[in-house]
Amino acid sequence: FLVFCIRGNSSMKIIDLSFNVEPNLSEPMSIKIKTRPHSGGSKFGRKIVFMGKRSLKDKAMAVIHYMSGKERITKKSFPDQEFINEQRISLSVHTGTHLDAPSHFGTRCEGKRPKTIDEIPLEWCYGNGVVLNFCNKGPCEEISVEDVKKELERIEYCLQENDIVLIRTDTDKKWGKPNYFYEAPGMSREATKFLVESGVKIIGIDCYSLDKPFMAMVKQY
């Protein structure tokens, strides 16, 4: 998830900027969420009887005891006839609010094996943030290095080492609709390079991806 903290004189406000993980029209890859309700706990409890590594003899005895009712778990076995609730979720790593690891982009990064998501230091994921506003950009338009420099000049800010830059385009207002995926601006190569060379450690954006939509990139290519 993504949070933004606003520090006041004596307190800090934490704002959750992340999207919910849920099936919707903005996600090009399917999300499946299967929920086992509390009322279905007895079915889960039934599986527990046969779980674990057992000898064939023990398994046979477990079946006999279950069929005879000696080890049978039903709704009545639980207080209020309820058991634990659980969810099984199937999704892409490129779902909702997420962090792309260097390994997402290729097999080499700066001449080395790129870091996978579990190798990303947590220190990379928090720090001082600055919001750059490009809400004036339309679908498939490019955010140039000149745009970035002008915005920094407008807010009177000089990028610092290890800053986290959040790119605002207001594309997130389309979340839940199909056009969220294909109607968004994107960072140019030069603009991204400028941020990286300025010492920025994380770049966030409210679009599906940091680049322009796939269809626009393919057409340009």
Locate each region found by the language model.
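Active-/binding-site microenvironments in catalytic and ligand-binding cores
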Residues: C5-Y221
